[in-house]
Amino acid sequence: MSFTGRPRITLALFMLAVLGALAPGAGTRAQNAASPTVYTIELVVFRNMSGSGGPEDWGAKAVARGPESPEQPVVTGRFVQSIPAAQFQLNDVAAKLQNTSNYQPIAHFAWQQTASTWGSRAGFTVAKLAGSVPGLSGIIYLERGSYLHLGMSLNYQTSNPPSGLAAPPGTVFNLTESHRVRFRTLSYFDHPAYGVIALVTPGNAATGGR
């Protein structure tokens, strides 16, 4: 099964059951010298309605993996274009989530860009990539060194967190992670309050990444 990430146990079981058959076949590894410089990135952000992760210190800020300082010279990724919904590749994943009672999509968007330098954390805001998504903000970045990494530092605020999280209304939940990614392989970014399923594929600006 083409799926990467470090999901919590309860959500991992759900993802294995629901998404396993939907994951695209593994493709070329991102570190291949012949890899294209334009990438298509598609994300489905969904809310965990169950609160099964339990209470935590919601004020704690995680630190994404990566070097203490970026590789030199520093290159900032270039935004190429947004991808229209008609060309989304994760519609089946979003539909599966929508049909559950515990995991509800709150955003689904895709775009093309070139990669930033590994360790630079140079990316684009949710507002630029997805427009206005109630309660969701932050930065998403694609970095390339020896390998390709997708990272994000997201904040999600809701007036009615699941009771199991023991979080008061208006709590801001921070998700900060960076994963090594491979083409056409689903990646999962995990938080007790919400999660992100991501797909990175070689992009072609002339064909909308297909």
PLM region spans:
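Aromatic-residue detector
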Residues: 1, 111, 184-187
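Cleavable N-terminal signal peptides
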Residues: 17, 26-28
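Functionally constrained cores in energy, signaling, and assembly domains
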Residues: 9, 28, 189
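C-terminal partner/receptor-binding element of secreted or periplasmic proteins
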Residues: 174-210
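Bacterial N-terminal signal peptides
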Residues: 12-21
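Extended, low-hydrophobicity segments enriched in charged/polar residues
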Residues: 29-181
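N-terminal secretory signal peptides that target proteins for export/translocation
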Residues: 1-7
